[in-house]
A protein has these predicted regions:
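Primarily secretory-pathway and cell-envelope proteins
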Residues: 18-62, 130-163
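A short tyrosine-centered beta-strand micro-motif
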Residues: 100, 114-124
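Short acidic/polar inter-strand loop motif in beta-rich domains
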Residues: 93-97, 109-112, 126-134
Length: 163
């Protein structure tokens, strides 16, 4: 009986901590400006004390290196200026306008599942010779829900599903 309750308890802990997932639909609008430069976009998660715990995505112009990365001001202060090669795994080229899907498995940058609780999802966009948009929204890992963020200039509407 003790063994069965231990197994059940372990299964519950694993399901809360290990199965957390975010599905993000991020819209990048088509802007009628010349010259048009695709925006740099960063998406990351912070714990309740605002310490970065996971970088979900970083889209930048690969041939430009980090030249314009500092324009992602919040990301640069929190992660970018001190980041090394560890963000290479989530770094990719800038994207064309349209809807883009992102998923996060609920793990930190070291691959460890984060415990259920309160976190902050950050989404920032900045465009060379353009504008800058930033969203910060509270999410609760371990509690399912849907979040909608309104459109801004550089970022269209964003849909977040916490699983």
């Amino acid at each position: 009986m003790k063994f069965a309750s231990l197994l059940l308890g372990a299964a519950l802990v694993t399901s809360v901590a290990g199965a957390a997932q975010l599905d993000i639909t991020l819209n990048q609008p088509q802007l009628d400006v010349q010259p048009y430069h695709r925006p740099y976009i960063a998406v990351w998660v912070e714990d309740a004390q605002r310490n970065p715990v996971a970088t979900i995505a970083l889209w930048k112009q690969m041939e430009e290196g980090d030249k314009w990365l500092k324009d992602l001001r919040q990301f640069w202060r929190k992660i970018g200026r001190s980041a090394g090669k560890e963000i290479d795994g989530v770094t990719g080229a800038t994207r064309r306008p349209g809807d883009h899907q992102l998923q996060w498995d609920g793990k930190d940058n070291l691959g460890k599942p984060l415990p259920a609780g309160e976190y902050l999802l950050n989404i920032e966009a900045s465009r060379e010779e353009g504008g800058r948009d930033y969203h910060r929204v509270a999410i609760t890992l371990g509690k399912q829900g849907d979040i909608s963020l309104p459109a801004k200039v550089e970022l269209g509407p964003i849909q977040i599903k916490v699983k």
